[in-house]
Amino acid sequence: MKKGIIGKKLGMTQIFDEKGNVVPVTLIEAGPCVVAQKKTVENDGYAAIQLAYEDAKKKHLTKAEVGHFEKAGVALKKHLKEFRLEDTSAYEAGSVVTVDTFAAGEKVDITGITKGRGYTGAIKRWNLHKLRMTHGVGPVHRQSGSMGVIDPARIFKNKKMAGQYGNEQVTIQNLFVVKIDAEKNLIAVKGAVPGAKGGIVFVRDSVKA
């Protein structure tokens, strides 16, 4: 990986390309981020930078977090994320990373926390088929069906059942960067991005591009 940045999902809209086609895009307010820590192969065994994003008050942070920022000599921030990079020679503690590190036409991987939908049935959670509505099926029609009554007489782990749906970390790969607005710290990517409006997302160059 060569670059990364922390951002906030603003929502979706649409823009028109040069041929007049409608392109659905997600707007992300990316950065500016501050380098809170730099890791090197010599000292840490791998090369990485730790980015900090969005100003925070001291009362909202732990003593360990406050001490970490004070040691680096940077302002207090809410969010921290480490990005492993091939080369960290261009970064030092206190360096600022902005959205113009990316460019239109590139492909990126974006990680976020999906919307939490609470306790959900197996039909909606796993897209299973409903049971037949007639001919002896009842009184329920939205259950997953038989799970092994006699043999093996138990339910295997990871069986698709009802439970918590959403609120999990998901990465969407190979999203196309349509536009960059360096003045407003905006990046527009084609397609949807996991999470609700205002959710924190991590943008990095694509590993499969």
Q: Where are these predicted regions, by residue range?
A:
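Extended basic (Lys/Arg/His-rich) segments that typically form rRNA-contacting surfaces
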Residues: 1-209
